[in-house]
């Protein structure tokens, strides 16, 4: 059995290398400084707007900050765009940012992200050579006291955000796109799919023109009812990820 994956082991602080946080190129807009507050002025992308062609990920990341293609931006702190190697052979797609991601602006830095790191290490895949993103770029939540609880995005919200994922894939040109969970799979395939039907198989997906692997989202491992079940689900996730070893270099 592989190393333990209890909740305590996943809760340690995760720190991303600051060198990976590229400052977006500021283009076709202007900014004002008011004391220490910088206000960016740019046009908003509404639901009816097609995305423009972007020269690179920095341009796409900056433009995504003004996305209004669905209402989720209204309650989110910020758009959480993808992060990582812009020439990665592997792109990992999750569901949406969580509370930690919404606050930091980076994908997969909360408990699910730390568990993903453990699984990638077990599968001998270097996360720093990968690109990680989400199918939906804003945190959807509902309040419970002082907490913000994750709420699953609707199919309309997934479809509204799908052009951003397609843009990331087109700019990176990865060899494999890895969908973590049902929402990611729906975005990749362009509609709902049963995870049981596609999990653990390298499959060509015509709509994005890429080989894809669908597996479980790390958060589903954390939700398993007891330590033994969590270990079983973690081991299964690692086994799926090992199918990617030939693309991990």
Stretches with model-predicted labels:
Residues 2-249:
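A polyanion-binding, active-site-adjacent surface
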């Amino acid at each position: 059995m592989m190393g333990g994956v209890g909740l305590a082991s996943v809760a340690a602080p995760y720190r991303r290398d600051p060198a990976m946080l590229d400052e977006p190129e500021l283009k076709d807009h202007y900014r004002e400084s008011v004391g220490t507050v910088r206000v960016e002025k740019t046009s908003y992308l509404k639901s009816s707007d097609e995305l423009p062609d972007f020269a690179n990920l920095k341009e796409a990341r900056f433009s995504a900050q003004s996305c209004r293609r669905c209402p989720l931006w209204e309650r989110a702190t910020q758009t959480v765009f993808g992060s990582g190697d812009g020439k990665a052979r592997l792109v990992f797609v999750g569901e949406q940012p969580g509370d930690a991601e919404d606050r930091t602006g980076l994908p997969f830095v909360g408990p699910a992200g730390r568990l993903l790191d453990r699984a990638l290490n077990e599968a001998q895949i270097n996360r720093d050579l990968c690109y990680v993103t989400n199918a939906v770029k804003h945190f959807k939540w509902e309040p419970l006291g002082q907490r913000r609880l994750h709420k699953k995005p609707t199919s309309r919200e997934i479809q509204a955000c799908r052009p951003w994922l397609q843009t990331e894939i087109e700019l990176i040109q990865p060899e494999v796109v890895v969908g973590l969970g049902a929402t990611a799979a729906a975005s990749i395939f362009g509609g709902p799919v049963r995870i049981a039907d596609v999990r653990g198989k390298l499959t060509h997906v015509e709509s994005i023109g890429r080989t894809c692997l669908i597996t479980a989202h790390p958060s589903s491992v954390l939700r398993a009812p007891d330590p033994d079940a969590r270990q079983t689900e973690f081991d299964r996730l690692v086994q799926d990820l090992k199918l990617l070893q030939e693309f991990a270099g």
